[in-house]
């Protein structure tokens, strides 16, 4: 018996060691199927676990007691307050699906647990509770000096910087509106910085929102946006701008366009307020983003053995659906220039705009040095006033709705929506191009960087539509799907009004988008284990009841600034344009079709591009970035472009993202203490660009991880992405699987079952030109040549379709 117990104990110890190693396996130069990447913290902290009530089951396993009534068991990453708790304060451990552990979380999305008023925290924060007129006056003078003294040097058209600025573009009117909003936020931030300096407020108090001083009784109160009055909280249709989704009056702006991002962890701003992260853990300056990019993120061709470019392209459409940031602008709405012409040098402090964070290029740079480039333009993101009208750190603006609601198709405002509608039969406006429906051409001269290319640029619900031709392809597909559905509804209900047909078609297309996202796309990205743990798997029948009025659906800085940028690694540097029988007809370098959509006017190109997306493999998500993005991004007619990898690293620092190690801790996993925990080649490269593992940028660290089982990203990105899509589901009252007790526009049971039939393959068939595309792979995100993924004819009854008879009145 003792021998058996010894063997069982040995097995437990071995399992713990393997789990800890697996969680931080670093990606090699090939795609490996790896063991389950369970975060090891609950198992590793045996002393802590022994204090929690558990009930024994059989053999080696123990089953935790359920959480108390009203308290949910969530993954550690969804209970961020645990990071700041002592071991005896940690929440009760509980069981999650797939054999995982979580916390019985009582603190929700808050970064800290409530503290008693007599705690040292409250005592230390014994500063004034109101803003004095002296502080307000001085802050106002500082702000006006900053605004009036700023250099008004714009980016010139035709340069890569100009094209990069278009990723923040919506309309000229919106750009000026966002300029005013951001200035209001900057004045509040400057007031916060001055108050903090004068009162010597600890950084910790700012980053944890422990400075309960309001702007409401000051001249800055007009910068605060009051929640809208929601006249009909039971509206069947969601609003265009995302307002009034949450039924609580003080939360009616949650998830709406123009609202700030949330954070999983407090920011790493150096002053706790808005100064970018610029120093390593030992106080020395962080190395430049371009140096890290060229050292760690080289271009290596690693085609994914299973998944295709449709994963990359659908992922970008989804990214544009849920987020669009804005860069700080000049007074006339022009883009800010931080470098001299052609990037020869960074502008002097006297000439430089306060929002400049130029990326330094070293003289020995193997690419940019050939062109004399020493500076890449980079401008900080626009801010939005804190929703609680309180002294706080800088919060980044998102211009579109935070929900998965097909906003690239419909826009994120009533005005944008009206510009897209035909106002006949519930349809969207389209351009008839010799019998093919394409998006209408735009009148916006800033939609494309080149005036010549701009003549064929398209108009949609999102200002970034023309960014790359594959994106335009899916935008056309979704617009066509709306009109197909609207036409079918009109045939079924000929007396229905244009407004009813439009809103019903929109409601159906949004549901289709959500179902494809959660049923087909997301499992590929994060793997089946995370889908189960975060309750993201769509039901086969019946309604979900996961809505939580306390969940803010806003995107997080960590998701926007790092984890979801994993898609940049999946981009191939070229499109292999394939004709009907799979023959490669043309190879197109992606920089040549950025903001240059003219090829879409070729009769067969739309079908050929769809075929390319489902046939050509995506690149593996790893530490390799295509040179099309790291050297030639938005080059236009120039011999060089920008470096997207360097931009991503710099953007994380601009947003105050914490280091990679901090997010390991948030997941409940051990921090890295040595570069030697990575494979030797990567460890050597890391040691050349970072002082310690505590300095590794989140985006970089996430790309170095080995993919989770059944997914394409590592465990850290998988957790951050899973958390985000849980927010989108739990915080969206109009999510397609909710019944009418939650969702005023709920589908009836028959309609919901029809929605569950939709697949991306069906949408490809229904909305292709059928010129060269007659069949599709049954699993549209899987390579057409992958074993078991047979091609199926578009007219084959075995390809499911949504029967819209369920919508007959």
From Swiss-Prot:
Keywords associated with the record: Acetylation, Disulfide bond, Glycoprotein, Heme, Hydrogen peroxide, Iron, Metal-binding, Oxidoreductase, Peroxidase, Secreted, Signal
Q: Which cysteines are joined by disulfide bonds?
A: 230-244, 448-457, 765-794
- Record-annotated site: Transition state stabilizer: 464
Q: Which residues form a coiled coil?
A: none
Q: What is its EC number?
A: 1.11.1.7
Q: What is one GO biological process annotated to this record?
A: response to oxidative stress
Propeptide feature: residues: 22-223
InterPro entries hit by this protein: Haem_peroxidase_animal, Haem_peroxidase_sf, Haem_peroxidase_sf_animal
Q: What happens when the gene is disrupted?
A: Females are sterile, and maturing follicles show defects in actin filament formation, nurse cell membrane stability and border cell migration.
N-acetylcysteine found at = 224
What domain of life does the UniProt record list for this protein's source?
Eukaryota
Localization terms from the record: Secreted
Q: Does the keyword Secreted apply?
A: yes
Q: What's any one GO cellular component for it?
A: extracellular space
Binding-site positions, heme b: 568
Q: Which cofactor does it need?
A: heme b
Give a single Pfam family match: An_peroxidase
As to how many cofactors bind and how, the note says: Binds 1 heme b (iron(II)-protoporphyrin IX) group per heterodimer.
Q: In which tissues is it expressed?
A: Expressed at low levels in the germarium and early follicles. Expression becomes progressively stronger during vitellogenesis, and is highly expressed in germ cells and somatic cells. A subset of follicle cells, termed border cells (BC), exhibit a high level of expression.
The residues forming the signal peptide are 1-21
Renumbered to this chain, region (Disordered) spans 36-55
Active site positions, chain numbering: 320
Q: Which reaction does it catalyse?
A: 2 a phenolic donor + H2O2 = 2 a phenolic radical donor + 2 H2O
Q: Which family does it belong to?
A: Belongs to the peroxidase family. XPO subfamily.
Q: Which PANTHER family match?
A: CHORION PEROXIDASE, OXIDASE/PEROXIDASE
Name-wise, this protein is Chorion peroxidase
What is the scientific name of the source organism? Drosophila melanogaster (Fruit fly)
Phylogenetic placement of the source organism: Eukaryota, Metazoa, Ecdysozoa, Arthropoda, Hexapoda
Q: Which gene encodes it?
A: Pxt
């Amino acid at each position: 018996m003792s021998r058996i117990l010894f063997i069982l104990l040995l097995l437990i110890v071995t399992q713990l060691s393997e789990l800890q190693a697996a969680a931080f396996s670093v990606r090699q130069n090939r795609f490996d199927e790896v063991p389950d990447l369970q975060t090891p913290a609950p198992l590793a902290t045996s002393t802590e676990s022994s204090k929690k009530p558990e009930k024994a089951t059989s053999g080696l396993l123990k089953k935790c007691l359920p959480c108390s009534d009203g308290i949910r068991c969530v993954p550690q990453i969804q209970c961020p307050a645990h990071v700041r708790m002592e071991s005896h304060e940690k929440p009760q451990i509980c069981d999650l699906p797939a054999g995982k552990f979580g916390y019985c979380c009582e603190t929700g999305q808050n970064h800290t647990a409530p503290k008693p008023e007599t705690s040292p925290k409250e005592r230390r924060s014994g500063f004034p509770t109101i803003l004095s007129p002296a502080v307000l006056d001085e802050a106002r003078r500082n702000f006006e000096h900053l605004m009036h003294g700023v250099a008004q040097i714009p980016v010139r058209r035709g340069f890569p910087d100009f094209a990069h600025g278009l990723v923040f573009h919506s309309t000229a009117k919106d750009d000026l509106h966002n300029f005013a909003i951001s200035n209001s936020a900057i004045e509040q931030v400057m007031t916060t910085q001055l108050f903090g300096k004068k009162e010597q407020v600890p950084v910790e108090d700012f980053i944890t929102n422990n400075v309960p001083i309001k702007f409401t009784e000051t001249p800055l109160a007009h910068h605060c946006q009051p929640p809208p009055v929601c006249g009909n909280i039971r509206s069947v249709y969601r609003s265009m701008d995302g307002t009034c989704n949450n039924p609580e009056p003080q939360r009616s702006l949650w998830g709406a366009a123009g609202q700030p991002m949330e954070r999983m962890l407090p920011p790493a701003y150096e002053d706790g307020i808005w100064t970018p992260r610029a120093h390593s853990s030992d106080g020395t300056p962080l190395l430049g983003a371009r140096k890290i990019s060229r050292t760690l993120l080289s271009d290596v061709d690693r085609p994914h053995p299973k998944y295709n470019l449709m994963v990359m392209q659908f992922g970008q459409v989804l990214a544009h659906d849920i987020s669009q940031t804005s860069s700080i602008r000049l007074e006339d709405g022009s883009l800010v220039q931080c470098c001299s012409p052609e990037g020869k040098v960074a502008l002097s402090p006297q000439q430089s705009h306060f929002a400049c964070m130029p990326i330094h290029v070293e003289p020995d740079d193997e690419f940019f040095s050939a062109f004399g480039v020493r500076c890449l333009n980079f401008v900080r993101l626009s801010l939005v006033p804190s929703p609680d009208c309180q002294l706080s750190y800088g919060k980044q603006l998102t211009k579109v709705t935070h929900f998965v609601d097909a906003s690239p198709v419909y826009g994120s405002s009533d005005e944008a929506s009206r510009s897209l509608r035909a106002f006949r039969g519930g349809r969207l406006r389209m351009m008839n191009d010799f019998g093919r429906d394409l998006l209408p051409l735009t009148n916006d001269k800033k939609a494309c960087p080149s005036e010549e290319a701009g003549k064929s640029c398209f108009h949609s619900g999102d200002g970034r539509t023309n960014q790359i031709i594959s994106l335009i392809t899916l935008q056309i597909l979704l617009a066509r799907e709306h009109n197909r559905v609207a036409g079918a509804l009109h045939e079924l209900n000929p007396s229905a009004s244009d407004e009813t047909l439009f809103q019903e078609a929109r409601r159906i297309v949004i549901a289709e988008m959500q179902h494809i996202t959660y049923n087909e796309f997301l499992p590929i990205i994060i793997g089946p284990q995370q889908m189960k743990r975060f309750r993201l798997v769509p039901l086969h029948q019946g309604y979900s009841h996961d809505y939580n009025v306390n969940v803010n659906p806003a995107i997080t800085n960590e998701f926007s600034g790092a984890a979801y940028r994993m898609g940049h690694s999946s981009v191939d540097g070229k499109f292999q344009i394939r004709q009907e029988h799979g023959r490669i007809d043309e190879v197109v370098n992606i920089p040549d079709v950025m903001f240059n959509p003219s090829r879409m006017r070729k009769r067969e190109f739309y079908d050929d591009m769809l075929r390319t997306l489902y046939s050509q493999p995506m690149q593996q998500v790893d530490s390799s970035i295509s040179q099309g993005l790291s050297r030639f991004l938005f080059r236009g007619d120039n011999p060089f472009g920008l470096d997207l990898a360097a931009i991503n690293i710099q953007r994380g620092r601009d947003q105050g993202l914490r280091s990679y190690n901090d997010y390991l801790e948030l997941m409940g996993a051990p921090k890295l203490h040595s570069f030697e925990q990575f494979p030797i080649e990567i460890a050597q490269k890391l040691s050349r660009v970072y002082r310690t593992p505590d300095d590794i940028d989140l985006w970089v660290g996430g790309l170095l991880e080995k993919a989770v089982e059944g997914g394409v990203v590592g465990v850290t990105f998988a957790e951050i992405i899973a958390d985000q899509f849980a927010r989108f589901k739990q915080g969206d009252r109009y999510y397609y699987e909710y019944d009418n007790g939650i969702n005023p526009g709920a589908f009836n049971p028959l309609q919901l079952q029809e929605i569950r039939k939709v697949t991306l393959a069906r949408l490809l068939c229904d909305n292709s030109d059928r010129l060269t595309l007659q069949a599709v792979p049954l699993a549209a995100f899987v390579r057409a040549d992958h074993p078991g993924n047979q091609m199926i004819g578009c007219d084959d009854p075995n390809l499911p379709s949504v029967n819209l008879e369920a919508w007959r009145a």
